[in-house]
């Protein structure tokens, strides 16, 4: 027997930018498809016209490509099972709506929103979970037809609802969660499959699309568990075999332990925000893959090829995945250290230009200087936009030292080191990192001061910071004139404060 051809889909709604949670869904489907040499489908679920954002689908596709996620079929690539936008499939949905109506498995419902809300209020008052109750209960076929014609004559527009069989259990063996089942009386009554504007509801359209596109596995977020029994109702009514379902656990904020919500401003949640900060796509791919999936071994840095080779949905976590910002920064730093320097230069240059620190068209000499600047900070950056704050001393006039910096150098040793180092700088033939380090060693010999008491006063006086890249490289890029100016400012500030 031939092995089943794996077909998965990622089906976003174009309601805004690509969210971390949606990116994870896309990524896991991508890895599953590639691991099994299957097919990944991109489908745009834009049936809810009110929620769609102009350019939303384009933005999401661009960010998926940036992450390194590609697909085999979709609105931009075509395929044998299109169209791949729900808004272009209305006639297809109507065919199956008509089939269910003709078979008596669905019906027109003319209850207004006001009547439905009144019904829900009554149920709440009785302590009953709100649910739809069949509006034609006890009526004959002729009476139902007459009631519908009267409603139609009043200008009321109907929805189409699907009959939910009574006393039935809907169950599936979830790839992540194991066996799950729901009783039909917990679904909420006959639910809408076509809205008043003629567009299908999500739980109907997704079934038709998945079946016709021959989707074999559906990997999606935990929030879709409650949709699955409704979709199984539709599968059963249409006589179709459902795909295998897998529901990934929620992503939580590692600081608060709460579900990652778009209202939680303590965490950046959209891929575009990380792009703007200068995160690398391979690092984001790596980090997101580890949100709820565990590779073999202790290593946490993998190539895309390694992830594809290892990916097994059986290793998807049953516990919520914690979004740890510090871990993301660590992973991105690992990738920055190994990144192509031209890539880092482009990202950092863009960040510096956005901050107004570098002209739009720098000279070749300036570009080479910026390249060296990026190189000395690369090992420290968690993302490239950090260079704007890290390297401000290279672009702005020196400010007075902070109280913490003054505290570090206010003793006699501090002044002695700074004054001697200034003398030694005048003795070096060329202002290069190697020569500068030689001047520091000469200062050590002249003063007898070493270690932190030697290097910290030199760093603070010359770069106006207690931390930073290699001190020799930093001073070389600052240039001798600025370094000496910084030293003079430091000595003046110490004198002004009687230090």
UniProtKB/Swiss-Prot annotation:
Its Enzyme Commission number(s) read 6.1.1.17
Q: Which family does it belong to?
A: Belongs to the class-I aminoacyl-tRNA synthetase family. Glutamate--tRNA ligase type 1 subfamily.
Quaternary structure and interacting proteins, as annotated: Monomer.
> What does this chain do?
Catalyzes the attachment of glutamate to tRNA(Glu) in a two-step reaction: glutamate is first activated by ATP to form Glu-AMP and then transferred to the acceptor end of tRNA(Glu).
- Which Pfam families does the record associate with it? Anticodon_2, tRNA-synt_1c
Q: Keywords in UniProt for this one?
A: Aminoacyl-tRNA synthetase, ATP-binding, Cytoplasm, Ligase, Nucleotide-binding, Protein biosynthesis
Question: Got a GO cellular component term for this one?
Answer: cytosol
Sequence motif 'HIGH' region, residues: 12-22
Catalytic activity line of the entry: tRNA(Glu) + L-glutamate + ATP = L-glutamyl-tRNA(Glu) + AMP + diphosphate
Q: What is this protein called?
A: Glutamate--tRNA ligase
Residues involved in ATP binding: 262
Motif: 'KMSKS' region; annotated at 259-263
Corresponding gene?
gltX
**Which GO MF terms does the UniProt record name?**
ATP binding; glutamate-tRNA ligase activity; tRNA binding; zinc ion binding
Report if keyword Electron transport is assigned: no
Q: Where in the cell is it found?
A: Cytoplasm
Record flagged with keyword Ligase:
yes
